[in-house]
């Protein structure tokens, strides 16, 4: 049919048919974030999940603004306040350390860059909801309202394990997470938008010599693996190497330094 032909034509032209992440390698791999997909972005703490998610949300909002579409990006931040998240986005886009922003340790050039970036972000169609421990029902209702009033291109959730379900606590956390991921997938289909949901990984990762994440590391979190259309992992080897610095001047230190570089 015509819609299928148009879709295939886009693929042949190597165009991004989904919501662009703004990250070239990722967009080439996925073709953007596709409607109705539940995309899981998982990793251990301090791996950069939120940093990656905020970059994707910012780039997607820029894309909407550039195309002058009646649409928006909804970011549900369960861990950070809207002020903290906004500061982080500002820091990343203005290329200024967030600690320096908080302490006022910025140069005049950085201040000018900060002001310009602030103006750009102010105009972005990016909604941040900072409700802690939000339920899947409440999140879904708010997403529906945003789509009805402003249009909606992408939902970001940071992160799954901080959400609550409507189940009795006696049902267990695994069942609760299962209801949440099933609800997020259902919402993606209902609103025909991609849902990018962040997830923590099992502590078992820390017990292995090879700490690169695997799908099995999601299994303690119920049906995440089964409900997701795409699973992506964030992994920084340098995070672990920094904690294993050998004695300065040793052969091991030279090898360690080579890996760090």
Q: Which sequence ranges carry the predicted segments?
A:
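Single conserved hydrophobic/aromatic residue that forms the stacking wall/gate
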Residues: 2-12
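N-terminal pre-Walker A segment at the start of P-loop NTPase domains
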Residues: 10-27
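Phosphate-binding P-loop
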Residues: 19, 29-36, 66-67
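Phosphate-binding/switch region of NTP-binding enzymes
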Residues: 27, 175-261
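Cytosolic-facing regulatory segments adjacent to core modules
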Residues: 28, 59-151, 165
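The conserved Walker
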Residues: 45
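Conserved lysine of the Walker
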Residues: 49
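Helical hairpin unit composed of two closely spaced alpha helices linked by a short loop
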Residues: 74, 152-197
């Amino acid at each position: 049919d015509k819609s299928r032909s148009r879709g295939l034509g886009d693929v042949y032209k190597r165009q991004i048919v989904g919501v662009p992440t703004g990250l070239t390698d990722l967009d080439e791999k996925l073709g953007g974030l596709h409607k109705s997909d539940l995309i899981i972005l998982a990793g251990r703490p301090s791996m950069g999940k939120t940093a990656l998610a905020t970059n994707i949300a910012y780039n997607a909002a820029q894309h909407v603004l550039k195309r002058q579409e009646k649409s928006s990006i909804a970011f549900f931040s369960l861990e950070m306040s809207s002020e903290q998240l906004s500061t982080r986005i500002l820091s990343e886009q203005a290329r200024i350390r967030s600690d320096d922003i908080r302490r006022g340790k910025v140069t005049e050039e950085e201040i000018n860059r900060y002001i310009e970036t602030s103006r750009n972000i102010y105009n972005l169609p990016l909604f941040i909801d900072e409700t802690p421990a939000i339920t899947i029902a409440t999140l879904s209702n708010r997403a529906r309202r945003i789509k009805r009033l402003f249009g909606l291109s992408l939902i970001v959730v940071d992160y799954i394990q901080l959400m609550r379900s409507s189940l009795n606590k006696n049902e267990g956390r695994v069942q609760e997470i299962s209801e949440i991921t099933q609800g997020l997938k259902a919402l993606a289909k209902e609103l025909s938008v991609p849902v990018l949901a962040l997830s923590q990984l099992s502590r078992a990762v820390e017990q292995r010599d090879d700490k690169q994440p695997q799908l099995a590391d999601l299994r303690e979190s119920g049906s995440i693996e089964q409900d997701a259309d795409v699973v992506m992992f964030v992994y920084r080897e340098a995070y672990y190497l920094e904690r294993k610095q050998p004695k300065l001047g040793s052969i091991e230190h030279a090898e360690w330094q080579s890996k760090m570089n």
